[in-house]
Amino acid sequence: DLSQYRCLWTLSIDGKQKDQGEITLPGVAPGESETIPLPASIAGKKASAKPTSDLRLTISFILKRDALWAKAGHEVAWEQFCIQEGAFLSSKLENRGRLKVREDEEHLSISGSGFSIQWEKNATGSLTSLTYHGKEILAHPADFPLQPITQAFRAPTDNDKSFGNWLAKDWSLHRMDNPRISLDFLKHEIREDGAVIVRVQTRNRYKEGMIVTKYLYTILSDGTIDLKTTFQPQGILPELPRLGIAFCLSSDYRTFIWQGRGPQDNYPDRKTSAAVGLWKGSVADQYVHYPRPQDSGNKEEVRRLMLTDR
């Protein structure tokens, strides 16, 4: 019987709530069904939205009155619908100023308006410094020797150790946790508009295979740094536990904002209970203290991510 519920709707664009309202429910008896029209304003919002925007409609049913088991306003069911899926756009990397470039046998340094970035031209081509307005962004713990680092390994979980331990065993046999990393080249060029292009290529060597990583940095005078990464597997490799690059940032950046599923952690096989939206939390809270250590803090369908010191 729908008479005991209120039906609320919200429309979000790119993770931000833009409109909301309530739908009057008809008297539908148990076991029966009826089609309920949506407000016309939803179609109007879709028509006026950018074709690249992400639109989500969330329908929620809440109790009208107190019940023995819950108070009025308690949500008993919800569902989210994708009205228009947002498009990923290529960055418009237009430079409007000049950059200073310094290079010697050991370092490549580039600086602009209030920022500087430096690479070490050693065996790995690691980033050694990234500062904005005098504040260092990167951290350099002893167990994180270079940045960015190609990561194709993670600690095995219970699932990886099941079925005869085959996944974790393969990773160990191929030495996925201990690659030998070398630098092929680190070079730069200056575009006609003054932007600096830095190309870095590294190799992660494992027992019988390797992963070649190509980094393409585009650096603008306002401090924008666009990084595109390409991975090329070669030789014999096991099923990879993961693949990506990792940076280690200063602990000052403790606030985590993302557009994607949340706010709780979610995974490919457990994500429909997490709505797509614009969420905010602390970095420390993303870790879940399970009785046995497992994956935690994962977020699915993330379109953008911000870390801030505020």
Pin down the residues of each PLM region.
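Aromatic-lined ligand-binding clefts that engage carbohydrates, nucleic acids, or primary amines
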Residues: 5-7, 245-246
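Intrinsically disordered, low-complexity Pro/Gly/Ser/Thr-rich segments with frequent PxxP/GP/PP motifs
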Residues: 7-71
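Local beta-strand/beta-hairpin segments that build beta-sheet-rich folds
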Residues: 18-20, 71-78, 83, 137
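Beta-strand/loop-rich accessory regions of lumenal/periplasmic or secreted enzymes
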Residues: 39-52, 65-67, 80-310
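A short beta-turn/strand-edge loop motif at beta-sheet boundaries
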Residues: 1-5, 236-239
